[in-house]
């Protein structure tokens, strides 16, 4: 094995020097604490000479009760990390001034740091809170530690900051319906998000997969709608928030100047509620909460007056818990097929004089009727409605605020129609359940790609609206955290951070003051602050250009190149040990001439490592082709009915065959029994296809598939056992001689992690090692015997 080591030790030395330096105080100064690290970037910042040093007995001066409350909050935070006795008095070295005459926006502040004093001035308690958050970000990142840190000089560089936000609405969406968040997990996010001046949490409390709020008049919502039976057969729940827990969380958020907006989905995405009270749907058939992802066809029936009575009663209880201005009513992804055949819905359309207008069907306008009627009811409580951009398909009242999620178009249409809009488009990076790196090695996600840079570079105000003077209708921006694939809170945080911090800067900082390169630098400081709160944030993984793979075959030699989604050091070992801060640093592609194990990880300036990738490198000889006589195009397939979660369960059946047939395409493995949107009453089965694959030329080939198993030449290449069958994350390569090779493909129809394997297309992909893209194995490559 020959490893290219050019400038390796020089780079290692530079890394160590840049990471560590000394101050006069004798404490080691961390590189991530250098410079100004405030997120989001302030509107105006002037650096000055000197610094303010915290010392034991420091006092925070505040006179009004509102200012004293904020002073007490930050005194506790400072004391927790420093161990200092931090007093709250009328006067102090740190002073909080509420000045009603100050020329600030309601959330604006001035922060003046000198060597002898610190003063925060604002016209509202909210402004004081944000000013103190900025002061804490001038201090070393360890100020957010959960315990005393003794080897830090607690100094803040002298500076003058004048600051206010770009947008009044700066939101993060959280979804406990698909996967629940405990009260403590919600509070943890509130603590962290408030550090970066996020002021709104959109709380998605109801959906097809779960109802998460106690409604006393309808106890079945929580007791029945709050639980589901997963595809694996286990019960999930019952999980929901009691009204007392809701009050506690809302109060906790308000103390940190975060408003919580509840979402009650209407009239679609409510299968959990319908499961508890079947009469809410058109047919009234008994159902259970959805245990798979996607859009449910069974929705509420707007033809029944009892549905509106139900919704109004639920709203009565919810508005008492959420004192904010807005109430989110959903309105998205509502299939209307059942309304077309429902006599009561058609009667409602007739009675209300609803008629198609050339742009909208009667059913779309019936949807608008629901939105308007609920909007009017909420107006009795002085609530303004927010709805997803589908509500524009009808004619919503002009007071409705549109949440544009399918792109900028919804926000543009809203503004042109006189509606305010909140920009939250998935295609533009604001769906944080998207991948943030190579899908081959990142945890399973819904799809898409939303890197930190993509989130950061989003501009919520389309140029079109600026040109016509309608940009004032864009009142804010929000990132969404749909939780289908957030199986626990660690995964949730892995997706939320640090991209939520990029969103915070998009929402607060004027576009002309944004600088992504500097943001990348400041993120290193923010990482340590997140460490203080125990946040499991994303660290970019070492990726192989063209698609990562942990099993590499070669015949003569192979060169492995690595990159990351943003600049970061990589360290590795070749002896099977785990890499660490003292391991060799990757500087150029690594060449291998014999078998080996490469362990490689990303290394932050704080010394924290990413997940370690273990890559098996194997020297192989070309697997000889086999002679096949009397063959036909296609594969032989055997089908066994039943649901098998894994190969062990399948093998226990003795593989009794119910159907023997032949197929022309690999996709027929997953389509033998048609799947449905709901997967109700679909007969599950396992299928094994055997035959041969015709390899066009000698070489090393990578195989990729979402099937359970892919065998080539008697070797198991792709093994997706026990995993969510999406995005083919277990690729493997093999050296093959030109010609025929045995092929076995295994499909198990089941639901794991909310995803039915039946929804996959059954395709098997391959690429030669010198090719950049995978290609589908086509029917002309498949052969079978009689």
What residues fall within each predicted segment?
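Bacterial Sec-dependent N-terminal signal peptides
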Residues: 1-34
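Contiguous, structured surface segment used for ligand recognition
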Residues: 23-167, 491, 507-517, 521, ...
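Short, compositionally stereotyped local motifs that mark structural "simplifiers"
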Residues: 39, 514, 520-648, 652-691, ...
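Coil residues (strongly favoring Ser/Thr
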Residues: 79, 100, 115, 145, ...
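Feature activates predominantly on carbohydrate-active enzymes
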Residues: 103-326, 342, 373, 377, ...
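Active-site neighborhood of glycoside hydrolase catalytic domains
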Residues: 290-291, 295-398, 405-413
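Flexible, acidic glycine-rich loops studded with aromatic residues
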Residues: 385-390, 395-400, 405-558, 565
């Amino acid at each position: 094995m020959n490893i290219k080591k050019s400038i390796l030790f020089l780079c290692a030395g530079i890394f160590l020097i840049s990471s560590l330096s000394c101050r006069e105080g004798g404490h080691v100064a961390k590189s991530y604490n250098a410079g100004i690290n405030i997120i989001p970037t302030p509107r105006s910042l002037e650096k000055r000479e000197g610094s303010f040093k915290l010392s034991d007995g420091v006092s925070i001066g505040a006179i009004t009760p509102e200012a004293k409350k904020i002073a007490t909050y930050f005194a506790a935070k400072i004391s927790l990390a420093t161990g200092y006795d931090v007093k709250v008095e009328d006067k102090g070295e740190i002073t909080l001034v509420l000045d009603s005459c100050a020329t600030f926006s309601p959330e604006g502040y001035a922060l003046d740091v000198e060597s002898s004093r610190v003063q925060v001035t604002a016209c509202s308690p909210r402004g004081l809170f944000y000013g103190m958050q900025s002061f804490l970000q001038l201090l070393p990142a360890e100020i957010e530690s959960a315990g005393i840190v003794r080897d830090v000089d607690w100094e803040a560089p002298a500076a003058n900051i004048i600051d206010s936000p770009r947008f009044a609405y700066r939101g993060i969406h959280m979804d406990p319906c698909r996967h629940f968040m405990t009260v403590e997990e919600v509070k943890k996010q509130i603590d962290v998000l408030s550090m970066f001046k996020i002021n709104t949490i959109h709380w998605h409390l109801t959906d097809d997969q779960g109802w998460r709020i106690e409604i006393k008049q309808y106890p079945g919502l929580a007791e029945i709608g709050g639980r589901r039976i997963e595809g694996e057969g286990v019960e999930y729940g019952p999980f929901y928030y009691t009204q007392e827990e809701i009050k506690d969380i809302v109060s906790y958020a308000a103390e940190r100047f975060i408003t919580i907006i509840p979402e009650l989905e209407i009239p679609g995405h409510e299968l959990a509620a319908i499961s508890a009270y079947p009469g809410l749907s058109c047919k009234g058939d008994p159902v259970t909460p959805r245990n798979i992802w996607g859009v449910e066809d069974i929705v509420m029936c707007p033809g029944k007056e009892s549905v509106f009575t139900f919704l109004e009663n639920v709203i009565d209880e919810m508005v008492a818990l959420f004192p904010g201005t807005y109430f989110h009513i959903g309105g998205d992804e509502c299939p209307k097929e059942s309304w077309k055949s429902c006599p009561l819905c058609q009667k409602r359309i007739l009675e209300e004089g609803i008629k198609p207008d050339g742009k909208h069907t009667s059913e779309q306008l019936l949807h608008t009727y629901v939105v308007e009627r609920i909007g009017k009811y909420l107006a009795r409580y002085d609530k303004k409605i927010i709805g997803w951009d589908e509500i524009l398909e009808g004619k919503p009242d002009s007071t409705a605020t549109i949440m544009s999620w399918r792109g900028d178009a919804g926000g543009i249409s809203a503004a042109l129609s006189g509606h305010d809009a909140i920009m939250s488009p998935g295609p533009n990076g604001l769906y944080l359940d998207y991948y943030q790196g190579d899908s081959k090695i990142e945890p399973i996600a819904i799809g898409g790609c939303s890197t930190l840079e993509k989130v950061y570079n989003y501009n919520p105000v389309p140029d079109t609206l600026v040109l016509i003077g309608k940009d004032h209708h864009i009142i804010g921006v929000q990132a969404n955290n749909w939780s289908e694939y957030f199986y626990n809170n660690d995964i949730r945080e892995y997706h939320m951070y640090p991209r939520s911090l990029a969103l915070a800067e998009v929402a607060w900082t004027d576009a002309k003051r944004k600088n992504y390169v500097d943001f990348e630098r400041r993120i290193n400081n923010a990482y340590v602050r997140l460490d203080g709160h125990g946040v499991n944030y994303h660290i970019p993984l070492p990726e192989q250009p063209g698609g990562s793979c942990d099993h590499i075959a070669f015949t003569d030699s192979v060169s492995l190149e690595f990159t990351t989604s943003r600049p970061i050091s990589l360290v590795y070992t070749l002896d099977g040990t785990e890499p660490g801060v003292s391991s060799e640093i990757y500087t150029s592609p690594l060449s291998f001439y014999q078998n080996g194990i490469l362990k490689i990880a990303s290394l932050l300036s704080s010394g924290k490592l990413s997940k370690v990738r273990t890559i098996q490198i194997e020297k192989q000889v070309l697997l000889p082709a086999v002679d096949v006589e009397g063959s036909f195009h296609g594969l032989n397939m055997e089908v066994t009915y039943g649901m098998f979660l894994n190969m062990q369960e399948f093998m226990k059946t003795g593989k009794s065959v119910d159907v023997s047939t032949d197929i022309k395409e690999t996709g027929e493995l997953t389509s033998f029994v048609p799947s449905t949107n709901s997967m109700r009453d679909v007969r599950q089965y396992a299928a094994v296809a055997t035959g041969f694959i015709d390899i066009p030329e000698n070489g090393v080939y990578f195989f990729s598939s979402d099937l359970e198993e892919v065998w080539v030449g008697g070797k198991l290449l792709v093994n997706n056992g026990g995993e969510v069958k999406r995005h083919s994350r277990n690729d493997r390569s093999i050296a093959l001689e030109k010609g025929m090779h045995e092929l076995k493909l295994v499909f198990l129809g089941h639901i794991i992690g909310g995803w039915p394997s039946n929804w996959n297309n059954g395709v098997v992909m391959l690429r030669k090692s010198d090719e950049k893209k995978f290609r589908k194995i086509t029917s002309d490559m498949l052969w079978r015997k009689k």
